[in-house]
Curated annotation (Swiss-Prot):
InterPro entries tied to this protein: Rbsml_eL15_core_dom_sf, Ribosomal_eL15, Ribosomal_eL15_arc, Ribosomal_eL15_CS, Ribosomal_uL23/eL15/eS24_sf
Any single Pfam family the record assigns to this protein: Ribosomal_L15e
NCBIfam families found in the cross-reference section: PRK04243.1
Entry keyword set: Ribonucleoprotein, Ribosomal protein
HAMAP family recorded: Ribosomal_eL15 (MF_00256)
PANTHER family membership: LARGE RIBOSOMAL SUBUNIT PROTEIN EL15, RIBOSOMAL PROTEIN L15
A cellular component term, taken from the record's GO annotations: cytosolic large ribosomal subunit
Record GO terms (molecular function): RNA binding; structural constituent of ribosome
Lineage: Archaea, Thermoproteota, Thermoprotei, Desulfurococcales, Desulfurococcaceae
SMART domains, sorted: Ribosomal_L15e (SM01384)
GO biological process, one term: cytoplasmic translation
Protein name as it appears in the record: Large ribosomal subunit protein eL15
Residue spans of biased composition, Basic and acidic residues class: 197-207
Chain intervals for the UniProt region annotation (Disordered): 197-220
Amino acid sequence: MSKSMYHYIAEAWKEKSRELEALIRQRLIEWRREPSVVRLEKPTRLDKARALGYKAKVGFIIVRVRVRKGGQRKPRPDSGRRPKRMGVYGYAPAKSLRLIAEERAARKFPGLEVLNSYYVAEDGRYKWYEVILVDPHHPSICNDPDVNWICEPQNRGRVFRGLTSAGKKMRGLRKSRGLRGTVYYKWKRKLKERELKKRHEASRGARDPWQIAEKLKEEK
Protein backbone atom coordinates (compact mmCIF):
# COMPACT_ATOMS: atom_id res chain seq x y z
CA MET A 1 0.00 0.00 0.00
CA SER A 2 1.35 3.41 -0.92
CA LYS A 3 2.09 5.82 1.89
CA SER A 4 1.07 9.44 1.92
CA MET A 5 3.27 12.49 2.16
CA TYR A 6 2.19 13.04 5.77
CA HIS A 7 3.57 9.62 6.72
CA TYR A 8 7.05 10.57 5.55
CA ILE A 9 6.84 13.96 7.27
CA ALA A 10 5.92 12.23 10.55
CA GLU A 11 8.78 9.73 10.12
CA ALA A 12 11.24 12.58 9.53
CA TRP A 13 10.15 14.31 12.77
CA LYS A 14 10.27 11.00 14.63
CA GLU A 15 13.76 9.98 13.52
CA LYS A 16 15.22 13.53 13.55
CA SER A 17 18.18 13.26 11.22
CA ARG A 18 21.26 15.44 11.55
CA GLU A 19 19.97 17.82 8.92
CA LEU A 20 16.66 18.28 10.76
CA GLU A 21 18.38 18.75 14.13
CA ALA A 22 20.65 21.40 12.62
CA LEU A 23 17.61 23.13 11.12
CA ILE A 24 15.75 23.08 14.46
CA ARG A 25 18.82 24.43 16.25
CA GLN A 26 19.04 27.30 13.78
CA ARG A 27 15.33 28.02 14.16
CA LEU A 28 15.56 28.10 17.96
CA ILE A 29 18.18 30.85 17.71
CA GLU A 30 15.66 32.95 15.79
CA TRP A 31 12.64 31.97 17.90
CA ARG A 32 14.30 33.08 21.14
CA ARG A 33 14.48 36.64 19.82
CA GLU A 34 10.82 36.71 18.83
CA PRO A 35 7.86 37.54 21.10
CA SER A 36 6.30 34.75 23.12
CA VAL A 37 3.21 34.59 20.86
CA VAL A 38 3.77 34.79 17.09
CA ARG A 39 1.26 34.28 14.28
CA LEU A 40 2.49 32.04 11.44
CA GLU A 41 1.57 31.74 7.78
CA LYS A 42 1.69 27.93 7.80
CA PRO A 43 2.30 25.17 10.37
CA THR A 44 5.80 23.89 11.06
CA ARG A 45 4.62 20.28 11.43
CA LEU A 46 2.11 19.88 8.63
CA ASP A 47 1.32 16.23 9.40
CA LYS A 48 0.49 16.97 13.03
CA ALA A 49 -1.58 20.03 12.21
CA ARG A 50 -3.63 18.16 9.60
CA ALA A 51 -4.23 15.25 11.98
CA LEU A 52 -5.58 17.68 14.60
CA GLY A 53 -8.07 19.34 12.25
CA TYR A 54 -6.12 22.11 10.49
CA LYS A 55 -7.14 23.08 6.97
CA ALA A 56 -5.35 25.47 4.64
CA LYS A 57 -8.27 27.84 4.17
CA VAL A 58 -9.66 31.10 5.50
CA GLY A 59 -10.70 30.92 9.15
CA PHE A 60 -7.79 28.79 10.41
CA ILE A 61 -4.84 30.48 12.11
CA ILE A 62 -1.59 28.99 13.38
CA VAL A 63 0.16 30.59 16.38
CA ARG A 64 3.50 29.61 17.89
CA VAL A 65 3.72 30.11 21.67
CA ARG A 66 6.82 30.03 23.85
CA VAL A 67 6.43 28.80 27.44
CA ARG A 68 9.07 28.70 30.14
CA LYS A 69 9.95 25.22 31.37
CA GLY A 70 9.91 24.04 34.99
CA GLY A 71 7.69 24.72 37.97
CA GLN A 72 6.64 27.93 39.61
CA ARG A 73 9.30 30.45 40.65
CA LYS A 74 8.32 31.27 44.23
CA PRO A 75 10.00 34.22 46.01
CA ARG A 76 12.06 33.20 49.02
CA PRO A 77 10.50 34.67 52.22
CA ASP A 78 12.52 37.01 54.45
CA SER A 79 11.02 35.90 57.77
CA GLY A 80 12.50 32.93 59.56
CA ARG A 81 11.20 29.41 59.23
CA ARG A 82 12.44 25.94 58.46
CA PRO A 83 13.84 25.50 54.96
CA LYS A 84 11.19 22.83 54.45
CA ARG A 85 8.49 25.44 55.05
CA MET A 86 9.97 28.15 52.84
CA GLY A 87 7.52 27.27 50.07
CA VAL A 88 10.10 27.77 47.34
CA TYR A 89 10.79 24.34 45.87
CA GLY A 90 8.50 21.55 44.80
CA TYR A 91 5.62 23.75 43.61
CA ALA A 92 4.51 22.93 40.09
CA PRO A 93 1.35 24.14 38.36
CA ALA A 94 -1.43 21.60 37.90
CA LYS A 95 -1.80 22.77 34.29
CA SER A 96 0.48 21.36 31.63
CA LEU A 97 2.72 23.68 29.64
CA ARG A 98 0.74 22.82 26.54
CA LEU A 99 -2.50 24.00 28.17
CA ILE A 100 -0.77 27.18 29.36
CA ALA A 101 0.35 27.82 25.77
CA GLU A 102 -3.22 27.37 24.51
CA GLU A 103 -4.58 29.83 27.08
CA ARG A 104 -1.97 32.46 26.19
CA ALA A 105 -2.80 32.13 22.50
CA ALA A 106 -6.53 32.51 23.28
CA ARG A 107 -5.87 35.66 25.33
CA LYS A 108 -3.79 37.11 22.50
CA PHE A 109 -6.59 36.48 19.99
CA PRO A 110 -9.82 36.86 22.02
CA GLY A 111 -12.13 36.55 19.00
CA LEU A 112 -10.87 33.06 18.09
CA GLU A 113 -11.36 29.61 19.62
CA VAL A 114 -8.64 27.03 20.26
CA LEU A 115 -9.11 23.87 18.21
CA ASN A 116 -5.98 21.97 19.28
CA SER A 117 -2.21 22.27 19.72
CA TYR A 118 0.98 20.26 19.37
CA TYR A 119 4.62 20.29 20.48
CA VAL A 120 7.28 21.76 18.20
CA ALA A 121 10.65 22.13 19.93
CA GLU A 122 12.41 22.95 23.18
CA ASP A 123 15.75 24.00 24.62
CA GLY A 124 17.08 24.17 28.16
CA ARG A 125 14.80 27.04 29.14
CA TYR A 126 11.72 27.14 26.89
CA LYS A 127 9.21 24.94 25.10
CA TRP A 128 7.48 25.91 21.87
CA TYR A 129 3.98 24.84 20.92
CA GLU A 130 1.88 25.63 17.88
CA VAL A 131 -1.81 26.32 18.55
CA ILE A 132 -4.55 25.93 15.94
CA LEU A 133 -7.09 28.75 16.25
CA VAL A 134 -10.44 28.97 14.47
CA ASP A 135 -12.67 31.96 13.75
CA PRO A 136 -16.16 30.77 14.83
CA HIS A 137 -17.88 33.70 13.07
CA HIS A 138 -16.39 33.18 9.60
CA PRO A 139 -18.76 31.74 6.96
CA SER A 140 -16.14 29.24 5.76
CA ILE A 141 -16.01 27.76 9.26
CA CYS A 142 -19.76 27.86 9.91
CA ASN A 143 -20.42 26.03 6.61
CA ASP A 144 -17.75 23.37 7.16
CA PRO A 145 -19.39 20.20 8.57
CA ASP A 146 -16.08 19.08 10.11
CA VAL A 147 -15.55 22.09 12.38
CA ASN A 148 -18.85 23.99 12.50
CA TRP A 149 -19.51 22.49 15.95
CA ILE A 150 -17.08 25.05 17.35
CA CYS A 151 -19.46 27.84 16.26
CA GLU A 152 -22.08 26.75 18.78
CA PRO A 153 -22.39 28.88 21.94
CA GLN A 154 -21.56 26.04 24.36
CA ASN A 155 -18.03 25.89 22.93
CA ARG A 156 -17.27 29.54 23.64
CA GLY A 157 -14.09 29.93 25.69
CA ARG A 158 -13.51 26.17 25.65
CA VAL A 159 -9.80 26.42 26.41
CA PHE A 160 -10.46 28.17 29.74
CA ARG A 161 -12.94 25.47 30.77
CA GLY A 162 -10.67 22.51 30.14
CA LEU A 163 -12.51 21.31 27.03
CA THR A 164 -9.53 21.03 24.69
CA SER A 165 -7.44 17.89 24.37
CA ALA A 166 -4.77 19.23 26.74
CA GLY A 167 -7.43 20.35 29.22
CA LYS A 168 -9.14 16.95 29.30
CA LYS A 169 -5.81 15.24 29.84
CA MET A 170 -5.02 17.59 32.74
CA ARG A 171 -8.42 16.84 34.30
CA GLY A 172 -7.83 13.09 34.07
CA LEU A 173 -10.64 12.37 31.61
CA ARG A 174 -8.68 10.03 29.39
CA LYS A 175 -10.45 6.66 29.11
CA SER A 176 -7.46 4.35 28.74
CA ARG A 177 -4.96 2.30 30.71
CA GLY A 178 -2.61 4.06 33.09
CA LEU A 179 -5.04 6.50 34.69
CA ARG A 180 -3.47 5.98 38.10
CA GLY A 181 -1.02 8.76 37.40
CA THR A 182 -3.67 11.43 36.83
CA VAL A 183 -4.14 14.43 39.08
CA TYR A 184 -7.63 13.33 40.08
CA TYR A 185 -6.47 9.84 41.12
CA LYS A 186 -3.64 11.26 43.24
CA TRP A 187 -6.02 13.74 44.87
CA LYS A 188 -8.50 10.96 45.65
CA ARG A 189 -5.78 8.77 47.15
CA LYS A 190 -4.45 11.65 49.26
CA LEU A 191 -7.96 12.39 50.48
CA LYS A 192 -8.33 8.82 51.72
CA GLU A 193 -4.99 9.02 53.49
CA ARG A 194 -6.02 12.19 55.28
CA GLU A 195 -9.29 10.64 56.36
CA LEU A 196 -7.38 7.74 57.88
CA LYS A 197 -4.88 10.11 59.52
CA LYS A 198 -2.00 8.64 57.54
CA ARG A 199 1.06 10.50 56.25
CA HIS A 200 -0.35 13.86 57.21
CA GLU A 201 1.93 16.24 59.06
CA ALA A 202 -0.87 17.98 60.94
CA SER A 203 -1.79 14.71 62.63
CA ARG A 204 1.52 13.76 64.24
CA GLY A 205 0.86 11.67 67.31
CA ALA A 206 -2.70 11.00 66.25
CA ARG A 207 -4.33 7.65 66.71
CA ASP A 208 -3.81 4.83 64.25
CA PRO A 209 -6.54 4.02 61.72
CA TRP A 210 -7.52 0.83 63.55
CA GLN A 211 -8.09 2.84 66.74
CA ILE A 212 -10.39 5.23 64.86
CA ALA A 213 -12.29 2.29 63.38
CA GLU A 214 -12.78 0.76 66.84
CA LYS A 215 -14.11 4.03 68.22
CA LEU A 216 -16.60 4.33 65.36
CA LYS A 217 -17.86 0.81 66.10
CA GLU A 218 -18.31 1.68 69.79
CA GLU A 219 -20.29 4.80 68.93
CA LYS A 220 -22.63 2.79 66.73
